Design a protein with these regions (language model features):
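Residues within the helices of the helix-turn-helix
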Residues: 14, 18, 39, 84-85, ...
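Active-site catalytic microenvironments for nucleophilic, acid-base chemistry
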Residues: 19-23, 44-47, 194, 198, ...
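Short, solvent-exposed alpha-helical surface patches in non-cytosolic proteins
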Residues: 35-46
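Short solvent-exposed coil/turn linkers within tandem alpha-helical repeat scaffolds
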Residues: 27, 31, 51-56, 103-107
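M14 metallocarboxypeptidase catalytic domain recognition
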Residues: 35, 59-214
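Short, basic alpha-helical nucleic acid-contact segments in DNA-binding proteins
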Residues: 44-51, 67-71
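Acidic, Ser/Thr/Pro/Gly-enriched interdomain connector segments
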Residues: 1-31, 36, 68, 75-78
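Calcium-binding motifs, dominated by EF-hand helix-loop-helix domains
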Residues: 5, 25, 29, 44, ...
Length: 215
């Protein structure tokens, strides 16, 4: 990822601010790496690892922000862990953890095993600009949160970017939704991603019967 320095203005700074918002810091997503954003980031890093910070966002700092952009983190099971305790520690739900880890027996957790832990916030942001970076992070997060989603690519754009798809279901009749296919016109991207997120969430919660459908 690009290194960001104090005073920088870019959509990537918006993503830093989005991650900090999700981590509990009330700052504006104005795309400016200014004093308020730096202060929030200092507090975030100090809480996470006790590190001091000079407001230069490098790969190490990005790595600490990524869970809040992808919507999940990984947890190594320790002796005495329970799903209920893990869920409380990460402020999420047991059902969300079970959806992301469908093969796990909640009554027989294996010490040393790794769990994907979805955070409780909605993954698809509605108040930031979209780029291929954010699109990729969201797709990764959705497929971790809802492993019954299948992700692939149908080719590459004129700019050399992969064109991804999500699929759900295995039925004979297919319904295909597409968008964001004219150069840098991204406005339909969050619409489709939000639709996919809400659809997958409803299916995981048993609120709809889609048994033989493609999305």
């Amino acid at each position: 990822m690009k290194v960001l320095n104090p005073g920088e203005r870019s959509v990537l700074v918006q993503y830093v601010q989005l991650a900090l918002n999700r981590a509990g810091y009330d700052i504006r997503k104005d795309g400016i790496l200014g004093e308020n954003t730096c202060r929030a980031l200092q507090q975030f890093l100090r809480k996470k690892s006790g590190e001091e910070f000079n407001c230069k966002i490098d790969d190490v700092v990005w790595g600490k922000l990524f869970p809040y952009l992808k919507g999940y983190t990984m947890h190594e099971i320790k002796s005495g862990d329970t799903l209920w305790g893990i869920a409380a520690n990460y402020d999420t739900s047991v059902s969300a953890i079970m959806t992301a880890n469908p093969t796990v027996n909640p009554l027989a957790l294996r010490t040393g095993s790794i769990l994907a832990i979805p955070f409780s916030f909605s993954l698809v942001a509605e108040d930031v600009a979209y780029t291929s970076y954010l699109n990729d992070w969201i797709l990764e997060g959705l497929t971790v949160r809802y492993p019954f989603l299948v992700q692939g690519n149908i080719g590459k754009s004129a700019m050399g970017k992969e064109i991804p798809y999500l699929r759900i279901g295995t039925g004979e009749r297919e319904v295909f939704y597409s968008g964001a296919y004219h150069a840098n016109e991204w406005i339909t991207t969050p619409v489709l991603l939000k639709f996919a997120e809400e659809y997958a969430h409803a299916f995981a919660a048993g609120r709809m019967q889609i048994g033989r459908a493609h999305v």
